[in-house]
């Protein structure tokens, strides 16, 4: 059926007069979008909903709009009408000031009794001059430029422009303090006579009408460049596969306030201070950080000769989005276009080629096999010292005010077991602490508690897990009140806050999860404000080819430097995970962590200095950006790549996900002047990079039995890969909206609410995107069949592993509902797992042989898949899964009707 016929069959919808059968229609070129329009301007307006680009911004309040007429109406109603009222009030106040001066001079004339007639005539001339100057100052000043097609085309006042023109954008903002500011007279500063007289200045005809406004302008010029002269577009893109989940608290204002003090105000620029004084304001950042965005070459990676680096490259999310444009063009450039974009790429080194495989040592398979097995001296239980235990009890009783029954659970043996559980279970997934130099006796109690509570989470006792949640209600705020949280912030503070956030994501409490989403931007913003004098900056003096013996000081510097990289990379991983699973706005991009990848794990896990010095790392790992380019630009999928550690491979997957999310948002389309088809081609290259990553991961770690299939770390890697692939090819919001509409208790299987989602599902089910998503969903179900479903709740180190089951069930149910027209009833069977296993094997073999989906999918198998997935989700005690489990239950009840 053609699209034209589909429109003719719409029931109960009046056809437009302008549209007749046979007229040309303009179709949306975005994949899986079935919409078409009779007018081209309507199509362009619809395309902006895909791109979500708001190119028309208000010069007053920096609000952004997708249409120019809406911007014009906003300016007229919200600003110009108020501006006229404020101008009249300002004129009345200024006239009152002028007449006061006139009366004062008139009294002086009466007292002087000299040349009365001459002064009386001059009073009228003076009054006329005042009124004329007031009218010209308001009527002849050019208004601010509101209407521009692009946000970046707004004219900025030049240095030599008049003060009235340069401050026209601020002069229209009438504050309550305007009248008081208009009476302030700025004292004249002179190099020859720096003293300021205490006598009131004499008002003359030349300065009577200009001084009040110049004082107001100078007092408010500091806020005119709040965002460095660029508007905050406030682009909000719904990337959520699950739109009803709690979203992150918006922090665009908090993330952008970092740029407020990067440029000193005009008062500091005009006054000349003595040469011995610093002309930079106290609140401004160091010069080397203000130059980071314009000339970031020296900060692109940790230099081998001892240059300093900051934990995050960009000081704000706005700067991150700008640098992401150049990175995307550099990643996908090839041939002539590569030469064009590489000149502006800020992360170039002397050689952009990826080092070959023989330049890196092979992954120590014996170490990894030993590391991922819960045995060996690495996991020898250690006992907590009695002094640390007593200090911990006093700390809990004094700062947390725990009840006596809770304090009784903190025995010396239990604290030791919880610490050992952290090292054996959670350190494998988040290795941010250095085990060789970590000493319990010297660790801060807040950091120690964050480790202990993670170990308490693995307990099967509900009271112990409740105690851990009770501690976390105060632990974060207790760290905020520490002296170490102020600048310069200590490294252990960031490590403790990161572990707290991981704990809140693990717990099943909805309140704890929302706290993690709320305070995640706070952690990122605190890490952005780190300056080179803080503890987060170290020097790279370890790497090199010199044969000089290493010292203990160099080892500690290397540990600090590696700790900084790990906390930065893992915070970035959490941010990309929240964007993928929970639909939050990305606060970090891969450009923020443009650093070399993590060092080999056997270097990081060295027990002492002698072991580390014996296996001295002589070559630094490649940067994450160059490895991403290797995956994207690799023409032959089977070409060899450097063998990286499992943690670096997972970081590369997060980097690909960050690039994919940036392409989906289309933030940089107007500036880059690219077509949507080219952007879609780039998305296809990212999907091919996903597949390349999966083949490399299997060939390096799984096929050689280096990593066990059942390890939680491996499960999380495979889960993230399948989720990213499905996200790249499927709009899960449409699928879930359709599932909710089907379960709506209305007579009839198809209602007015299900027309649009059903049309998308039917179009999507007949494309190649559905085949890719089906393949990933089958792999997720295969992981489910390999696991042992227990009746007791499971508390492990997986964050988003359970979400894969719901996504896979949603994808397969939608395809079966759309392609299979037959309505067969499900046979009553006792062993659902075996029947689902046969169905998964059948569909997978058909896809490998190239058969179409409609020939192999069966709608009658949907209840079997939903039953098994619902049984698996009941094992994970997450409150966030409650609504999705309810959707599955409603689908099952709907199918049985």
Curated annotation (Swiss-Prot):
It comes from the Eukaryota. InterPro entries: Transcription_factor_dom_fun (IPR007219), VerF-like (IPR051059), Znf_C2H2_sf (IPR036236), Znf_C2H2_type (IPR013087). CDD domains: fungal_TF_MHR. Disulfide bonds: none annotated. GO terms for biological process: DNA-templated transcription; positive regulation of transcription by RNA polymerase II; regulation of transcription by RNA polymerase II. Keywords: Metal-binding, Nucleus, Repeat, Zinc, Zinc-finger. A zinc finger (C2H2-type) spans 26-50, 56-79, 93-119. One of its GO terms (molecular function) is RNA polymerase II transcription regulatory region sequence-specific DNA binding. Pfam families: Fungal_trans, zf-C2H2. It is found in: Nucleus. One of its GO terms (cellular component) is nucleus. This is Zinc finger protein zas1. It comes from Schizosaccharomyces pombe (strain 972 / ATCC 24843) (Fission yeast). The gene is zas1.
């Amino acid at each position: 059926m053609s699209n034209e016929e589909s429109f003719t069959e719409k029931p109960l919808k009046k056809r437009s007069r302008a549209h007749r059968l046979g007229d040309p229609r303009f179709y949306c070129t975005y994949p899986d979008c079935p919409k078409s329009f009779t007018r081209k301007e309507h199509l362009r307006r619809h395309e902006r909903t895909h791109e979500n680009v708001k190119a028309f911004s208000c010069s007053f309040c920096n609000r952004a709009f997708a249409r120019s007429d809406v911007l014009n109406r906003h300016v007229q109603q919200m600003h110009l009408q108020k501006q006229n009222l404020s101008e009249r009030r300002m004129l009345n106040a200024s006239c009152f000031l002028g007449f006061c001066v006139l009366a004062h001079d008139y009294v002086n004339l009466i007292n002087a009794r000299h040349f009365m007639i001459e002064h009386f005539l001059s009073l009228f001339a003076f009054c006329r001059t005042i009124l004329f100057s007031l009218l010209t100052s308001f009527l002849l000043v050019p208004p601010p430029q509101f209407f521009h097609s692009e946000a970046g085309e707004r004219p900025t006042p030049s240095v030599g422009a008049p003060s009235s023109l340069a401050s026209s954008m601020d002069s229209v903002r009438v504050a309550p303090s305007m009248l008081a500011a208009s009476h302030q007279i700025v004292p004249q500063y002179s190099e020859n006579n720096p003293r300021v007289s205490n006598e009131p200045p004499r008002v003359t005809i030349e300065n009577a009408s200009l001084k009040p406004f110049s004082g107001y302008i100078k007092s408010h010029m500091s806020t005119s460049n709040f965002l460095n002269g660029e508007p905050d577009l406030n682009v909000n893109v719904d990337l959520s596969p699950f739109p009803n989940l709690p979203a992150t608290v918006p922090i665009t204002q908090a993330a952008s306030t970092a740029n407020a003090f990067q440029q000193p105000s005009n008062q500091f620029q005009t006054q000349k201070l003595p040469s011995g004084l610093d002309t930079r304001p106290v609140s401004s950042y160091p010069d080397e950080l203000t130059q980071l965005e314009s000339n970031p070459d020296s900060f692109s990676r940790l230099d081998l000769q001892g240059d300093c680096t900051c934990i995050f490259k960009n000081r704000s999310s706005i700067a991150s989005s700008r640098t992401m444009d150049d990175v995307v063009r550099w990643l996908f450039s090839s041939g002539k276009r590569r030469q064009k974009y590489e000149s502006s790429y800020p992360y170039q080194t002397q050689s952009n080629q990826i080092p070959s495989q023989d330049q890196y040592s092979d992954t120590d398979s014996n170490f990894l096999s030993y590391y991922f097995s819960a045995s060996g001296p690495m996991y020898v239980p250690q006992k907590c010292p009695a002094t640390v235990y007593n200090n911990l009890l006093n700390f809990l009783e004094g700062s947390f005010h725990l009840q006596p029954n809770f304090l009784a659970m903190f025995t010396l043996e239990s604290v030791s077991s919880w610490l050992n559980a952290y090292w054996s279970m959670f350190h494998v997934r988040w290795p941010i602490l250095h085990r060789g130099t970590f000493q319990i006796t010297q660790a801060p109690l807040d950091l120690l508690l964050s480790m202990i509570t993670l170990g308490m989470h693995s307990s099967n006792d509900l009271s112990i897990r409740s105690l851990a949640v009770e501690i976390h209600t105060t632990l974060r705020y207790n760290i905020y009140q520490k002296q170490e949280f102020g600048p310069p912030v200590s490294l252990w503070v960031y490590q403790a806050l990161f572990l707290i956030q991981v704990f809140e994501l693990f717990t099943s409490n909805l309140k704890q999860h929302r706290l993690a989403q709320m305070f995640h931007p706070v952690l990122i913003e605190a890490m952005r404000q780190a300056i080179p004098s803080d503890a987060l900056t170290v020097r790279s003096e370890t790497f090199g080819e010199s044969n000089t013996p290493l010292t203990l000081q160099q080892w500690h510097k290397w540990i600090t430097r590696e700790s900084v990289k790990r906390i930065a990379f893992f915070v970035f991983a959490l941010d990309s995970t929240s964007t993928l699973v929970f639909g939050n706005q990305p606060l970090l991009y891969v450009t923020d962590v443009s650093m070399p990848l993590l060092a080999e794990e056997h270097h990081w896990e060295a027990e002492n200095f002698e072991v580390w010095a014996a296996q001295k790392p002589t070559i630094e790992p490649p940067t994450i950006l160059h490895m991403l380019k290797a995956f994207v630009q690799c023409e032959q999928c089977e070409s060899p790549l450097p063998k990286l550690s499992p943690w670096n491979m997972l970081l590369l997957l997060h980097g690909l996900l960050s690039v994919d999310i940036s392409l989906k948002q289309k933030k940089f389309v107007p500036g880059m002047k690219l077509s949507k088809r080219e952007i879609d081609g780039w998305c296809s290259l990212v999907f091919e990079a996903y597949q390349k990553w999966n083949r490399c991961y299997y060939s390096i770690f799984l096929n050689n039995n280096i990593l066990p299939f059942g390890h939680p770390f491996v499960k999380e890697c495979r889960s993230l890969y399948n989720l990213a692939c499905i996200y790249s090819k499927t709009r899960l919001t449409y699928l879930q909206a359709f599932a909710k509409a089907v379960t709506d208790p209305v007579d009839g299987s198809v209602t007015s609410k299900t027309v649009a989602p059903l049309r998308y599902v039917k179009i999507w089910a007949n494309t190649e995107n559905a085949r890719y998503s089906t393949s990933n969903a089958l792999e997720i179900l295969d992981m489910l069949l390999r696991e042992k479903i227990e009746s007791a709740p499971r508390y492990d180190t997986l964050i988003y592993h359970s979400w894969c089951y719901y996504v896979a069930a949603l994808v397969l149910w939608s395809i079966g509902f759309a392609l299979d027209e037959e309505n067969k009833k499900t046979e009553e069977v006792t062993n659902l797992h075996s029947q689902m296993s046969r169905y998964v094997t059948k569909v997978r073999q058909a896809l490998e042989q190239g058969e179409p989906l409609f020939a192999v999918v069966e709608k009658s198998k949907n209840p079997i898949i939903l039953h098994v997935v619902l049984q698996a989700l009941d094992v994970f005690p997450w409150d966030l899964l409650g609504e999705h489990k309810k959707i599955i239950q409603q689908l099952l009840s709907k199918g049985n009707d």
